[in-house]
């Protein structure tokens, strides 16, 4: 893990509980997870289409919350895109919207800006879940989630 572990240690003393690829928000009793995909790091437009890119972004977050026992309900989407890829960006956003609706996830906000490469970051927030009902990787069994 290296630097990822070091970064997590810096923030792990905050009021929320960080672990297993998502955090637990004590005050609202919700799980939250975020993932980012970057063009030419996580995918290349020559090999992945708009539907595959949208699927990768959503599923990486969805599985983090679901495997912890939660149900993703809300999302915040941040998109950075090159001006010459406007149509492709809109197509990816349409695919994200379709898949989100299929999974009962409401995109409630986010941000857009221009950049040299396409970058998308999605944060998903779960329904309420009691702390005692969270499934931890260390104690998970087949059929838990």
Listing of model-derived features with the role each one plays in the protein:
Residues 1-49, 68, 73, 77, ...:
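Extreme N-terminal cap/leader segments of soluble proteins
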Residues 5-7, 15-20, 57-60, 101-106, ...:
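Short amphipathic alpha-helical surface micro-motifs
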Residues 7, 59, 64-67, 114:
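Hydrophobic side chains within alpha-helical segments
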Residues 37, 71-145:
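Glycine-rich anion-binding loops of enzyme active sites
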Residues 48-52, 56, 87, 134:
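Residues at secondary-structure transition points
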Residues 53-65, 95-99:
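Short, well-ordered amphipathic alpha-helical segments that serve as non-catalytic structural scaffolds
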